[in-house]
Amino acid sequence: MTASSPSLSPTLELACELIRRPSVTPLDADCQALMMRRLEAAGFALEPMRIEEVDNFWARRGGDGPVLCFAGHTDVVPTGPLQAWQHQPFDALIDDQGMLCGRGAADMKGSLASMIVAVERFVADHPKHKGAIAFLITSDEEGPAHHGTKAVVERLAARGERLDWCIVGEPSSTSLVGDVVKNGRRGSLGAKLTIRGVQGHVAYPHLAKNPIHLAAPALAELAAEHWDDGNAFFPPTSFQVSNLNSGTGATNVIPGELTALFNFRFSTESTVEGLQKRVEAILDKHGLDWHVEWALSGLPFLTEPGELLDAVAASIRAVTGREARPSTSGGTSDGRFIATMGTQVVELGPVNATIHQVNERVLASDLELLTEIYYQTLVRLLA
């Protein structure tokens, strides 16, 4: 079945139109123009925000009262080797198993289509709804994420924009649509560590200082350290070394320097400052000549049970009969930026089994369920 098939539902038709636009990050490939046309027709005021090379937009419909925002991204990751795909990644085909195939089908153009169609239907059914509905869309989520949601949120906060609730369309489900929702994320703190030694000949180790030998005990202690116990919402903080580089490429030269990249995924039981101090104390304990450059990608955030989480859970239950399991596992998302506005944030999207993979796909019928879940959530919060 192709994207032009007359038998496609409004959600699948729009999802296919979006997938057929090759919006490899940070490109948008006119996905947002398509979405904005639909939202403008539904009575939204539009505010495109191009920041550096990134396309973003903010759209809002309604008056005073609580604001429910739908957030997401139009950019996708690169395809990988085209010959490995069963169907071309931007053809947007539905196979004989009922799977919508294509880059972005799960992450996250399927969610975007479900959001738009759900909102169109809600506005038609409830033209005088309470509060306001908003959209915050970027083309810089899969890339550096400097000029996307983060920058838009800064502008919105500076002018006092209100955001009470936000649904981010990230693919949160694991096996069945709606089985898991993300009600928070761990923080991410990365670092580049440099250990300085003295280069020399391997036959004369007394004239050199081997930074590999010097660093090994400290790295082992960092890897074994118990950082915290986590809590009811978050697992314990984890520390992982992701890169280790040293040496000249020669077997007879003791290197003069070692660099290590490492990352913390941390819970609300730890702070950035606390983790940094503990790392630096361990490095000092081992008498190392060290330098570290820290990079904070995001702080942990948590949406506890309340209006948004209750409405989402009730909608999933009504549509699928499932009890959604709240989770804070996985990587970071743009929800970390939106949460800084004091917003209740929940991530809800399709099954994530094939995201970023060759042959990315999502069950077409799941997008219909997702559309209905979004619609029912709108009804519960704003009808």
From Swiss-Prot:
Cofactor note: Binds 2 Zn(2+) or Co(2+) ions per subunit.
Disulphide linkage map: none
Gene3D superfamilies attached to this UniProt entry: Zn peptidases
Ligand binding (Zn(2+) 1): 73, 107, 170
Signal peptide: none
Cofactor(s) recorded in Swiss-Prot or TrEMBL: Zn(2+); Co(2+)
EC annotation from Swiss-Prot or TrEMBL: 3.5.1.18
GO molecular function, one term: zinc ion binding
InterPro entries listed in its UniProt record: ArgE/DapE_CS, Bact_exopeptidase_dim_dom, DapE_proteobac, Peptidase_M20, Peptidase_M20_dimer, Peptidase_M20A
Pathway: Amino-acid biosynthesis; L-lysine biosynthesis via DAP pathway; LL-2,6-diaminopimelate from (S)-tetrahydrodipicolinate (succinylase route): step 3/3
Binding-site residues for Zn(2+) 2, renumbered to this chain: 107, 142, 356
Entry annotated with the keyword Disulfide bond: no
Enzymatic reactions: N-succinyl-(2S,6S)-2,6-diaminopimelate + H2O = (2S,6S)-2,6-diaminopimelate + succinate
Active-site annotation: 75, 141 (proton acceptor)
SUPFAM superfamilies: Bacterial exopeptidase dimerisation domain, Zn-dependent exopeptidases
UniProt keywords, alphabetically: Amino-acid biosynthesis, Cobalt, Diaminopimelate biosynthesis, Hydrolase, Lysine biosynthesis, Metal-binding, Zinc
Gene Ontology biological process: diaminopimelate biosynthetic process; L-arginine biosynthetic process; lysine biosynthetic process via diaminopimelate
Described purpose of this protein according to its UniProt entry: Catalyzes the hydrolysis of N-succinyl-L,L-diaminopimelic acid (SDAP), forming succinate and LL-2,6-diaminopimelate (DAP), an intermediate involved in the bacterial biosynthesis of lysine and meso-diaminopimelic acid, an essential component of bacterial cell walls.
Family matches, as PANTHER family: ACETYLORNITHINE DEACETYLASE, N-ACETYL-L-CITRULLINE DEACETYLASE
Subunit-level organization: Homodimer.
Family note: Belongs to the peptidase M20A family. DapE subfamily.
Protein name (Swiss-Prot/TrEMBL): Succinyl-diaminopimelate desuccinylase
Species annotation: Pseudomonas aeruginosa (strain UCBPP-PA14)
